[in-house]
Each structure stands twice: as C-alpha cells, then as structure tokens.
Swiss-Prot record:
Record bears the keyword Aminoacyl-tRNA synthetase: no
Listed transmembrane segments: 28-48, 56-76, 98-118, 128-148
Pfam families: UPF0220
Family per similarity comment: Belongs to the UPF0220 family.
One Gene Ontology term, aspect cellular component: Golgi membrane
Organism: Homo sapiens (Human)
Protein name: Transmembrane protein 50B
Primary location: endoplasmic reticulum
Alphabetic keyword roster: Acetylation, Endoplasmic reticulum, Golgi apparatus, Membrane, Transmembrane, Transmembrane helix
N-acetylalanine: residues carrying this PTM: 2
Annotated gene: TMEM50B
Annotated compartments: Endoplasmic reticulum membrane; Golgi apparatus membrane
Assembly with partners or alone: May form homotrimers or homodimers.
Length: 158
C-alpha cells in the first residue's frame, strides 16, 4: 500500500506552460489569501463594533501574522542555504535565526487565534463569528506565507 499512487500522474494541460508562470500564480494566490484574511477580520470588526462583542486586542494576532509574513519572505532560500549570503553582520546563521523567529511568530499567532476562538467564543454563550474571523484571518495569512515562500522559484533571478 506504500507505493499505491507512485505512478499516478494528473493529466496535464498542454495549452498552458505553468513552469513559466509559477511565480506569478503563486504570488496571485498568496495575495488573494492574504487579502481575504484581512477582509474577513475587517468585516467582523464592522459587524461587531463593540469591545464586548469583539475585543480590539484580538487584532494583534493578525498584526503579528502580517509581521511574520514579511519576516519570512524577506529571507530568500539561497540566503538560508548560504549560497549567496556570505558577508554581512550575521551571514547564513543570521538569516536562519531571522527565518526561525518569523516562523515562531507565525505559529504563535495561529495558536493564539485558536485560543481566542475557543476561550472567548466557543465556551461562552456569544456569537462565534468574531472568533472564527480571528482564526481564519491568521490561517489564511499562514497559508499565504507558505505559498509565497515555497511556491515560487528563485532560479529566474540568478
């Protein structure tokens, strides 16, 4: 059962060459996910304007996710491998530490949004939509970060 789908291939569309458009498609998909995450949170803030319904401190999860998005994508894969980043104040180790801190912020924001969802909304007798908005905002920013970081190729720039 381990090699069940080893020889399975999806039928390829011959009319579009995806290898040339991989960076554009990954960037557009990541941008749509990032925009949708913030749009859901802004919608929840408009629908539930009172702090009793949606605490304004819950926006910090999305802010830290956005900060982590920029931190993670500021470091190229070549810098992490050490191919193109030999000089500088910290070099390859600094790039890896920066990327690690970015992923810690991203996972921390995602976990905090789940905590907000269950701690402030699911266990209480209130509307769950603001908690879902906080969670989906962070989840969509998380997936957009992964797509933007690992969905693009860097060979075109060298």
């Amino acid at each position: 059962m381990a090699g069940f789908l080893d020889n399975f291939r999806w039928p390829e569309c011959e009319c579009i060459d995806w290898s040339e458009r991989r960076n554009a498609v990954a960037s557009v998909v990541a941008g749509i996910l990032f925009f949708t995450g913030w749009w859901i949170m802004i919608d929840a803030a408009v629908v539930y304007p009172k702090p009793e319904q949606l605490n304004h401190a819950f926006h910090t999860c999305g802010v830290f996710s956005t900060l982590a998005f920029f931190m993670i994508n500021a470091v190229s894969n070549a810098q992490v491998r050490g191919d193109s980043y030999e000089s500088g104040c910290l070099g390859r180790t600094g790039a890896r530490v920066w990327l690690f801190i970015g992923f810690m912020l991203m996972f921390g924001s995602l976990i905090a949004s789940m905590w907000i969802l269950f701690g402030a909304y699911v266990t209480q007798n209130t509307d769950v939509y603001p908690g879902l908005a906080v969670f989906f905002q962070n989840a969509l920013i998380f997936f957009s970060t992964l797509i933007y970081k690992f969905g693009r190729t860097e060979e075109l720039w060298t």
